[in-house]
Amino acid sequence: MRLDHISYVASHDQISDVVNRIGSQISTAFIDGGIHPKFGTRNFTAPLLNGQYLEIVCPLDHPATDATPFGQAVKKKAEAGGGWLTWVFSSSDLAGIEEKFGRKAADGYRTRPDGSELKWKQIGVKEIIGSGELPFFIQWLTDNHPSKDGNSVAKISKLVIADDEKLADSWFQDEIKSALTGVEIEWVKPELNEGDKGIVAVELTVNNSKIRLD
């Protein structure tokens, strides 16, 4: 298991501005990741060092947005003004994770504007709707990982997460913490995040400078 990507939400009307702003801050160009037809969302991705990437995602005016957990989570965050949605861990085998959740992972895919398709399985998205501090889990089924799309100069150095219990309510607390090689977690009280648990900010190292994205 390893930290795969971090996900930030913007509204459909604001996503272009957010992509330009964050891309400038981290000195990295985003690419149009295309539409998630199954989830009713669209994303842009920026490659990061260490095989990770940053996703900016928005909800679409589409029935799938309200019909799927990921679409619901993105729409809810967008309606609240946007910001950090979640962190995502990848594994080459989700069987053990599926066993603990008591259900199978859902299939996901998206087609980029150039026609290439990405496929994966994901699980744990239902839980992040009410518990923003929890990550979800993904298994990639294709090799064209978004971290390979362009030049990477930024790396994740710290996650600031509002959670008094420090993931004590997660089945995967130990696995998550051991997978965060080179990434610090700063735990803060939910009161500092308007009472909500979840990611407050992400600190990235860009050309030896620290950049904080709230």
Residue spans for each PLM region:
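Glyoxalase I/VOC metalloenzyme domain signal
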Residues: 1-4, 8-29, 41, 47-214
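A short beta-turn/loop motif at secondary-structure boundaries
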Residues: 36-39
